[in-house]
Amino acid sequence: MLCLAVAGPVTGPQVDITNNHWQFDAGKVAAAMNVRAYLLINDFTAQAMAHRDLLQQDRSLPTNHRQILRGGTPDHSTPLLVIGPGTGLGVAALVPAGDDIKVIEGEGGHVSYAPRNPAEEIILAHLAKKLGHVSAERIVSGPGLESIYHCQTGNHRPAPDIGALALAGDEAGLAAVRLMLQSLGTVAANAALSFGTRAGVVIGGGVAVKLSAVLGDSGLIERFDDHGRRRPYLQSLPIYLSVDPLAGLRGAAAAIDNRYLARRIILV
């Protein structure tokens, strides 16, 4: 049995990878690996499944795979939001369903970017000239961080270098990182309100964990809470940081045993 998690919308065995030119055929991969059955899921479905223990007891997961960024008063009978920037912006939710859970496999990274201040409006205008529609993941992602830095400084740097500058205290690097993380706060709050999340929010993906040293004073949580009449609602939600480098693999393994995802298993 093989579970494959790929970065693109899954509607069949062939998937176009969102942020590069690759095409992926799960049936051909399964045949090449000589397996009799496979399950194909979105990569952030796998990330979300790695945090199912926040809704149901599961002793198979390590106890140190998350850090608490902000405590709260969770209601575990409601959806859990899992969101995170990497090469794109992944968004998924886990919903309690009897003695199991369902995964809402959304494309929330492609909602329209909503600036909240003049600096963000400048970034939006800069990208709109090139792209037309500017989705959230054009800003809240590794490539998004590069776009922010270029717009603010006129210089091109890869995202790891910008992150390293920020961690070293470089003013320009910090400014770019803070804008990206505050924008993540906006998108995460919008998603939490849309899903009716009360179980909490898990921030995953490869970018946030590498910037964990500056998360506390980045303004991310303050921006997350800054939603007018629903501030008390959002302030009640615990926020976690996923620090498990194997989260995707653990979640993919768990997907095979999930009652609802297992219905999509294809026999070769």
Where in the sequence are the language-model features?
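Short beta-strand segments
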Residues: C3-A7, I41, L81-G88, A92, ...
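Short coil/turn connectors at secondary-structure junctions
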Residues: N34-R36, H76-L80, T197-R198, S236-L237
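Short beta-strand-loop/turn "lid" adjacent to the catalytic site in phosphate-handling enzymes
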Residues: M1-L40, T45, M49-D58, A208-A213
